């Protein structure tokens, strides 16, 4: 299944966007739970155009730079809707290199294990701080949050990401206490 297809269709549901705009969403809001690179996005835009799910118009920026502005077609809206209402199985386990290292922690000295977990804790705390900043920005710019709010979907994934990182930080702290004990 081409999930990137649905991510792009969903973004275009908000309105007309350029490929650059779509890439920016993957670096910001969508980046909290989904990733896609420039090299993946543009071929997918071509496929979606060929399938009739999106169209584009070309604009000129400056004197020469052509910019494609993409919009969702009615069949693209229907394709997105059909995907949204389709129930999905729970995905396979996400690959997490740090957790693989944790599994083999007995190969490390106590100090090496502590250093590994401290490094991960620092990175997760920084990520949590970034997410908290995004949350504060969202809540300051939004009307009271409800199902009918235009940013409700962003609120959902952001609060889930916050909870995930809070739990990860808490878990790392408890494991560090165990490692450093004795």
Curated annotation (Swiss-Prot):
It is found in: Cytoplasm. PadR repressor activity is inhibited in the presence of phenolic acids, which directly modulate PadR binding to the promoter of padC, leading to the dissociation of PadR from the operator DNA and expression of padC. In the presence of MgCl(2), binding is not altered by phenolic acids. Coiled coil: none annotated. Changing residue 70 to A: 3.7-fold reduction in the binding affinity. The record marks 70 as: Important for activity. Contributes to protein stability and DNA binding. It comes from the Bacteria. Changing residue 145 to P: Retains the repressor function. PAD activity in induced cultures is increased 2-fold compared to wild-type strain. Keywords: Cytoplasm, DNA-binding, Repressor, Transcription, Transcription regulation. GO terms for cellular component: cytoplasm. GO terms for molecular function: DNA binding. Disruption phenotype: Deletion of the gene results in constitutive expression of padC and constitutive phenolic acid decarboxylase activity. Induction: Expression is low and appears constitutive. InterPro entries: Tscrpt_reg_PadR_C, Tscrpt_reg_PadR_N, WH-like_DNA-bd_sf, WH_DNA-bd_sf. Transcriptional regulator involved in the regulation of the metabolism of phenolic acids. In the absence of phenolic acids, represses the expression of padC, which encodes a phenolic acid decarboxylase (PAD) involved in the detoxification of harmful phenolic acids. Acts by binding to the padC promoter region, preventing the transcription of the gene. Belongs to the PadR family. Contains an N-terminal domain (NTD), which harbors a winged helix-turn-helix (wHTH) motif that is used for DNA binding, and a C-terminal dimerization domain (CTD). Homodimer. This is Negative transcriptional regulator PadR. The lineage of its organism: Bacteria, Bacillati, Bacillota, Bacilli, Bacillales.
